[in-house]
Amino acid sequence: MGFFSFFSKEKKETLDKGLSKTKESVFGKIARAIAGKSKVDDEVLDNLEEVLITSDVGVETTLKIIERIEKRAADEKYMNAKELNVILRDEIAALLTENNSDDVDDFETPVAKKPYVIMVVGVNGVGKTTTIGKLAYQFKKAGKSVYLGAADTFRAAAVEQLVIWGERVGVPVIKQKMGADPASVAFDTLSSAVANNADVVLIDTAGRLHNKVGLMNELTKIKNVMKKVVSDAPNEVLLVLDGSTGQNAFEQAKQFTLATEVTAMAVTKLDGTAKGGVVIGISDQFKIPVKYIGLGEGIEDLQVFRKKEFVDSLFGGNA
């Protein structure tokens, strides 16, 4: 890990605050599930299963966790219900480690990839454009030159919002008129970025799910056109999901992974919701790394996802 991987006190406080409702909800339910129990029996496991499912961890992932807890209880003779949080913590941490690549250092990109091209996808309303703006801020803060491409040409609000973010952060935004070909915008953005030796390019795309074939064709066209400028573009396809929607986020992930090759995910709006368990389930089911999490409206509230710190925050004071 590099120098920038240092997890500051401020970042920890933001993470703890952002996950507080999930922590309070989940552990309140777990406390009730094991109240008065002296051992991990079938009733405790059934109650825990219900808690995890209702916390938006997802059925498949929940059953996987329960099976692992049963095995550990048998193998290691953990029969005291008070040990349940320790076991649960271990197994969630293990799942996240299995399904995510190594934690990335703060907002860094491979030096050899220039420009590093990130195509950002997701349905309207999940915080996609805001995430792009916050990423641009963080990349610029890390000393990188950034270009934004307004390829969501079907919504005037999306283009306007990206322009506002560009002005706020101080990075150029490439746009065309409403209804323009999104691939053309992406082409222009990469051309400008290459001409100006930019480090990072973020391409906003339309978030329409009503036509899966249309979505697939549109994203494929954008990719193919970008390759004419940068042969290995996009270097990353980042899917933005709204964590507060719980199970709906699973469906969105399913639709977009069918439409294009998603390489990383950002889960937003985890503050103000008790549905933070969705991060665990989505990571497990789709085997795609969660790279960023959104923990508030502030420009600094988008964080690189760190597995250990995430689990520590959820279980802090409870293990």
Residue ranges of predicted features:
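Switch/coupling subdomain of P-loop NTPase systems
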Residues: 2, 9-15, 20
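Short beta-alpha junctions and helix-cap segments that line functional grooves
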Residues: 3, 104-106, 135, 251-253, ...
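Intrinsically disordered, compositionally biased charged tails
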Residues: 5-8, 196
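P-loop NTPase catalytic nucleotide-binding module
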Residues: 6-7, 313-319
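Primarily NTPase-proximal linker/entry elements flanking Walker-type ATP/GTP-binding cores
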Residues: 16, 20-151, 158-178, 186-194, ...
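Short hydrophobic/aromatic residue motifs in ordered secondary structure
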Residues: 59-61, 155, 271, 299
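Conserved catalytic-core segment of NTP-binding enzymes
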Residues: 161, 181-196, 211-316
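Short glycine-rich anion-binding loops that position phosphate/pyrophosphate groups of nucleotides
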Residues: 206-208
